[in-house]
Curated annotation (Swiss-Prot):
Protein name: Probable transcriptional regulatory protein Ctha_1786
InterPro entries in UniProt: Integrase-like_N (IPR017856), TACO1_YebC-like_2nd/3rd_dom (IPR048300), TACO1_YebC_N (IPR049083), Transcrip_reg_TACO1-like (IPR002876), Transcrip_reg_TACO1-like_dom3 (IPR026564), YebC-like (IPR029072)
Family annotation (Gene3D superfamilies): 1.10.10.200, 3.30.70.980
Annotated GO biological process: regulation of DNA-templated transcription
Principal place of residence: cytoplasm
Length: 250
């Protein structure tokens, strides 16, 4: 899930768990395949594919798996024909939820997503019902041990930096316009500053803080959505209260 400051570290730990469960490779393969199908198999001329391949390599995906995923996308070898679909709705406590999926059976996927949402007390809405509450941005995470705030500001202002978030304990979050993400990455690489990840993110204009039962239900809902094989990304505008975080860490 893409969420915010207080529990960003928890999400990173969860991502490592997702990898152990084998979920991450499935999602990465789908993203590579779709990117190659939409923009061609040459990463030099297809920024989305280049980003997908970089993320796959960063997560230790074998080169042969990456090659086959690209070839499925370009039609060189047979494979499932994935379709991209976005769903919008509301979760516990009235939080806004955007779900991005890649599926070869949209009827199956919408039924499964609706079931997960409804059993958590949420509901699917119409297209556009909550997406207006978010902005699509380029996002890069950089460990605070590798660079200072001043260093990043100076380096990235000419490379499309829109915001530099510092409220996570261990990481800076660089936000750019989507079209400037590649420029920001290249500036960091030229300065030999390693980044944890680079991605397209949906940033909420405002967040809703959840506590108690709502926080627990929302976290379970997001976990269930992310565990679904067809779901690629889940975005919400929730923030978890300090008391709920303490309980989560017990």
């Amino acid at each position: 899930m893409s969420g915010h400051s207080k529990w960003a570290t928890i999400k990173r730990k969860k991502a490592a768990t997702d990898q152990k469960r084998g979920k991450l490779f499935t999602k990465l393969v789908k993203e590579i395949t779709i990117s190659a199908r939409m923009g061609g198999g040459d990463p030099d001329g297809n920024p989305r594919l280049r980003l997908a391949i970089e993320n796959a390599r960063a997560n230790s995906m074998p080169a042969e798996n990456i090659k086959r995923a690209v070839q499925r996308g370009t039609g060189e070898i047979d494979g499932a024909n994935y379709e991209e679909i976005s769903y919008e709705g509301y979760g516990p406590g009235g939080i806004a939820v955007i779900i991005e999926a890649a599926t070869d059976n949209r009827n199956r996927t919408v039924a499964e997503v609706r079931h997960i949402m409804s059993r958590s007390g949420g509901s699917l809405g119409e297209s556009g019902s909550v997406s207006w509450m978010f902005q699509r941005k380029g996002s890069i995470s950089i460990a605070k041990s590798l660079a200072s705030e001043e260093q990043l500001m100076e380096l990235l202002l000419e490379a499309g930096l829109e915001d530099l978030k510092t409220d996570d304990e261990d990481y800076f979050s660089v936000l750019t316009d989507v079209k400037d993400l590649e420029s920001a990455k290249k500036a960091l690489e030229a300065a030999k500053i390693a980044y944890e990840d680079a991605k397209i993110d949906m940033i909420p204009d405002n967040t809703i803080e959840l506590d108690g039962e709502d926080a627990e239900k929302a976290l379970k809902m997001v976990d269930a959505l992310e565990d679904n094989d067809d779901v690629q990304m889940v975005y919400t505008n929730m923030e978890i209260s300090e008391s709920a975080l303490e309980k989560l860490n017990q």
